[in-house]
């Protein structure tokens, strides 16, 4: 549904911190399904860990937040070029269940559960090969810049 060129319209992030490769499904105001392909060429593997590359959990959480950002911007029909930014505002109930390694394709499924006064809340899960990797409740804030 959205390739990396279209995703960059809705996220201010750029290489090496753009963590969403493609959006597969998006229903405005409801949910997004996106993914990231993990390759050995990720810069983070130079230090995490050189002899045993594991994609950092914090990067998985950031990727979830970026997917939420795409859903939020698309739902509000806004972009960063409109002077708006979608900030990562909080996280609850984080769980890590499986390591992510080079060669994995991580799917991020994020569902909006509420939005009040510019704060949006999402239930998110990350999976690889239909196995749960990470789950979290993520909050994002729509702000003017």
UniProtKB/Swiss-Prot annotation:
Keyword set, alphabetical order: Cytoplasm, Lipid A biosynthesis, Lipid biosynthesis, Lipid metabolism, Lyase
Gene Ontology cellular-component terms listed: cytoplasm; membrane
EC number: 4.2.1.59
UniProt-annotated location(s): Cytoplasm
Matches recorded under InterPro entries: FabA_FabZ, FabZ, HotDog_dom_sf
Superkingdom classification of source: Bacteria
GO biological process, one term: lipid A biosynthetic process
MF terms in GO: (3R)-hydroxyacyl-[acyl-carrier-protein] dehydratase activity
Cystine pairings recorded for this chain: none
Catalytic reaction list: a (3R)-hydroxyacyl-[ACP] = a (2E)-enoyl-[ACP] + H2O
Residue numbers annotated as active site: 48
Listed PANTHER family: 3-HYDROXYACYL-[ACYL-CARRIER-PROTEIN] DEHYDRATASE
Similarity comment: Belongs to the thioester dehydratase family. FabZ subfamily.
Function text: Involved in unsaturated fatty acids biosynthesis. Catalyzes the dehydration of short chain beta-hydroxyacyl-ACPs and long chain saturated and unsaturated beta-hydroxyacyl-ACPs.
Name under which the protein is recorded: 3-hydroxyacyl-[acyl-carrier-protein] dehydratase FabZ
């Amino acid at each position: 549904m959205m390739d990396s060129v279209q995703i960059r319209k809705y996220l201010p992030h750029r290489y090496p911190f753009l963590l969403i490769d493609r959006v597969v499904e998006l229903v405005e105001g409801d949910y997004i399904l996106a993914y990231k392909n993990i390759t050995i060429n990720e810069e983070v593997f130079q230090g995490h860990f050189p002899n045993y590359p594991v994609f950092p959990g914090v990067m998985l959480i950031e990727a979830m937040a970026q997917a939420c950002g795409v859903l939020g911007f698309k739902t509000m029909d806004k972009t960063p070029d409109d002077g708006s930014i979608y900030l990562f505002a909080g996280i609850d109930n984080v769980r890590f269940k499986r390591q992510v390694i080079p060669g994995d394709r991580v799917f991020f499924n994020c569902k909006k559960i509420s939005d009040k006064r510019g704060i949006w809340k999402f239930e998110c899960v990350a999976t690889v090969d239909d196995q749960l990797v990470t789950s979290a409740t993520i909050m994002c804030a729509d702000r003017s810049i």
